[in-house]
Amino acid sequence: MFVDLNSDLGESFGSWKMGNDDQILPVVTSANIACGFHAGDPLGILKTVRKAVELGVTIGAHVSYPDLVGFGRRNMDLSRDELIADVLYQISALDGLAKVAGSKVQYVKPHGALYNTIAYDQVQAAAVIDAIKMYNPELVLVALAGSNLVEQARAAGLKVVSEAFADRAYNSDGSLVSRRLEGAVLHDSAFVASRVVSMLKNGGVESIDGVFTPIQADTICLHGDTDGALEMSAAIKAELVKNNIEIRPFVNKA
């Protein structure tokens, strides 16, 4: 049994610091690096890319709606052409920086509101899928486990991996509990680490309503910007190793 660990990185902007990239990168196998639309500036993004290359971490484009003010967490009703152009712009920008650093973008993981919207909105999902195929049809798409997007993207010919979240509560339908609700984000490192192992071994988690909910987890997202994130990430990795679950990139395994 194996699993990939990913995290959202490169999100600092000028003097504003977000996350703990230098501490999280040695833990993960895949880095979802901001492309400047929800967070990140060119210098900071390039530094994160270079550190990822140095550590042998796979690079992915963390594409977003154009929403710096809202950190990409606000829904946007963009036209198909605009969304395609936005996604193409972001992938190509990050891929250019990765090329300079001696690597390349190997997957795409949408961010925030875009991630949540295309999980079920087939129109916007089609625009994102088409943009990825236009740029490089070999890129892997990271999608919410159990969402409509998984099958929609596969039907369109993309490679897809299903993502689960280590520190997020789930509804009984497999969707994430809204961050606005109490209990949406989990903070107990030992509990979360045990939950991740259980998710992988049993193929699901207990929902916020106490119902077993099937979750396929090809990759697990570790948040680097929450309280206790470093402790939690280390605990998860240690628990995986303890249970003989191999940690390796999903690229070429999708």
Curated annotation (Swiss-Prot):
Biological process (GO) annotations held by this record are: carbohydrate metabolic process
Does this entry carry the keyword Nucleotide-binding? yes
Instruction: State the EC number(s).
Output: 3.5.2.9
Please name the GO terms that the record assigns under molecular function: 5-oxoprolinase (ATP-hydrolyzing) activity; ATP binding
Keyword annotations for this protein? ATP-binding, Hydrolase, Nucleotide-binding
Q: Does the keyword Disulfide bond apply?
A: no
**EC class of the enzyme, as a word:** hydrolase
Tell me what reaction this enzyme catalyses: 5-oxo-L-proline + ATP + 2 H2O = L-glutamate + ADP + phosphate + H(+)
Gene3D superfamilies named among the record's database cross-references: Glycoside hydrolase/deacetylase
Tell me the domain of life.
Answer: Bacteria
Q: How does it assemble?
A: Forms a complex composed of PxpA, PxpB and PxpC.
Regarding protein family, the annotation reads: Belongs to the LamB/PxpA family.
**Family matches, as HAMAP family:** PxpA (MF_00691)
Q: What is this protein called?
A: 5-oxoprolinase subunit A
* Source organism: Acinetobacter baumannii (strain AYE)
